Amino acid sequence: DRYVESTRAIMQENAVYPNMLALAERAWLGGGAGYFNAPTAALSPEASAETREAFVDFERRLLWHNDRVFAGEPFPYVAQSHAQWYISPVYPNGGDLTASYLPEEQYLKQMKAHQYTPPAEVGGEAYPYQRTSGGSGVYLRHTWGDICYGLVPNASENSTVYATAWVHSDADTTAGLIFETQNYSRSEADVAPQQGTWDYKGSRLWVNGEAIAPPRWLNAVGQRNIDLPLANENAASRPPLQIQLQKGWNQILIKLPIGRFTLPEIRLNKWMFAAAITTPDGGKALPNLQYAKPSL
């Protein structure tokens, strides 16, 4: 496994305390909503109302322990059960990771016209989305393919998908955004992204039509090196982005192309995203934030 510089880095990168409590919950109570390849997990589109309610209760108790038991300890988890993302159809990109498709074109046109209010329903040409996902972290295709559940069935290489969310803020505010499109495995020697890019897939991010730049990567691009510790490649190990939310509705768009599932720089090229809107310091989910839930 990859060299690490401190015990704290291990706890932070691997979310040890949140995962420990999640494992304890299931080991103590049993139950659950399907095996790990089932599309019925707590925040997936096919989850039952009872499963979702159970997760909301679990999350409440998880965060209670964060505040009272693990204060000051690395605990990379914020509330996400209220989040709602809309996912576009899959667009074959023929290997062109820069190609634009209808969701991007319509979004930029709507943002230029200041059309921030969510529609009553999605699925048409103006809002071409066909599935939803709750939560702030979504695997379109799991690292291990069909062995584990991913949102896009029968995912294939050279594909592009978009994810969008509408969020309502009570006031103009600066918020944090915990964001990543590649979670670097701690058992791999994968190479940091090139400066000015989010990953090796061509992912992009917009908030109200403004393109959001990636951070400056601390590890320089180079050869794969198992003895080089991860720096700020993963969102858990860097400050959140600072984004501006306007009073009223805001729309976020994430472009998620994928080329090959394995690259010279990244052995496990993960088709995924994490996007959690937080307080500016990233410590908690932003209070009083409302996600729109148009019908499909």
Annotate each language-model stretch with its function.
Residues 148-161, 227-235:
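Extracellular beta-rich ligand/substrate-recognition surface
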Residues 57-156, 186, 217, 255-296:
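Accessory carbohydrate-binding/adhesion or oligomerization-edge regions at the termini
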Residues 171-177, 185, 246-249:
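Short tyrosine-centred short linear motifs in exposed loops/low-complexity segments
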Residues 190-192, 196-273:
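Beta-strand-rich ligand-recognition modules
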Residues 34-57, 123-129, 135, 223-234, ...:
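Surface-exposed intrinsically disordered loops and tails
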Residues 157-161, 168-178:
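Extended extracellular/luminal ectodomain segments enriched in beta-structured repeat modules
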Residues 1-82:
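Flexible, acidic glycine-rich loops studded with aromatic residues
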Residues 165-171, 181-185, 258-260:
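Beta-strand elements of well-folded, non-transmembrane domains
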